[in-house]
């Protein structure tokens, strides 16, 4: 017998934490706006927004939020731009560790941190030409919470 599990995007009753970087705030605020609108569209009413200085500081806050067991998912939003950050590789590498925290705590941790070469690319991914990656991250969080509940 083959069984296929497929989750929907109904977020009613879910509680999410959004951790957003203040660095490159003109980008991250657009990502946050997209995420909050997406949550609203999917029926999520309970969202906690946590602001951190930058993407480098996210793993510590993600770990604390995951360990608290208060949330169904954690969404990380940020923008690391190669041209604007001399230590791009270090910051991008540290922020990429976020996913392992989710596995460790059995909670969906969604990586919505843009890593781009230019400011223009980041702007495109924050709500112009390439959609809004914050909105996509929020929808992914809702779906993953529902999927894990099916397992």
Curated annotation (Swiss-Prot):
Binding site for (2S)-2-hydroxy-3-oxobutyl phosphate: 84-85, 125
Keyword Chloroplast applies: no
The protein's enzyme class: transferase
This protein's GO CC annotations: cytoplasm; cytosol; riboflavin synthase complex
Keyword hit for S-adenosyl-L-methionine: no
Catalytic residues identified in the record: 87 (proton donor)
Reactions listed under catalytic activity: (2S)-2-hydroxy-3-oxobutyl phosphate + 5-amino-6-(D-ribitylamino)uracil = 6,7-dimethyl-8-(1-D-ribityl)lumazine + phosphate + 2 H2O + H(+)
One Pfam family per UniProt: DMRL_synthase
InterPro entries: LS (IPR034964), LS/RS (IPR002180), LS/RS_sf (IPR036467)
Binding positions for 5-amino-6-(D-ribitylamino)uracil per the UniProt entry: 23, 55-57, 79-81, 111
Its EC number(s): 2.5.1.78
Gene Ontology biological-process annotations: riboflavin biosynthetic process
Pathway in which this enzyme or protein is active: Cofactor biosynthesis; riboflavin biosynthesis; riboflavin from 2-hydroxy-3-oxobutyl phosphate and 5-amino-6-(D-ribitylamino)uracil: step 1/2
Molecular function per GO: 6,7-dimethyl-8-ribityllumazine synthase activity
Keywords: Riboflavin biosynthesis, Transferase
Function recorded in the entry: Catalyzes the formation of 6,7-dimethyl-8-ribityllumazine by condensation of 5-amino-6-(D-ribitylamino)uracil with 3,4-dihydroxy-2-butanone 4-phosphate. This is the penultimate step in the biosynthesis of riboflavin.
Cross-referenced PANTHER family: 6,7-DIMETHYL-8-RIBITYLLUMAZINE SYNTHASE (PTHR21058:SF0), 6,7-DIMETHYL-8-RIBITYLLUMAZINE SYNTHASE DMRL SYNTHASE LUMAZINE SYNTHASE (PTHR21058)
Family the entry assigns: Belongs to the DMRL synthase family.
Protein name: 6,7-dimethyl-8-ribityllumazine synthase
Gene designation: ribH
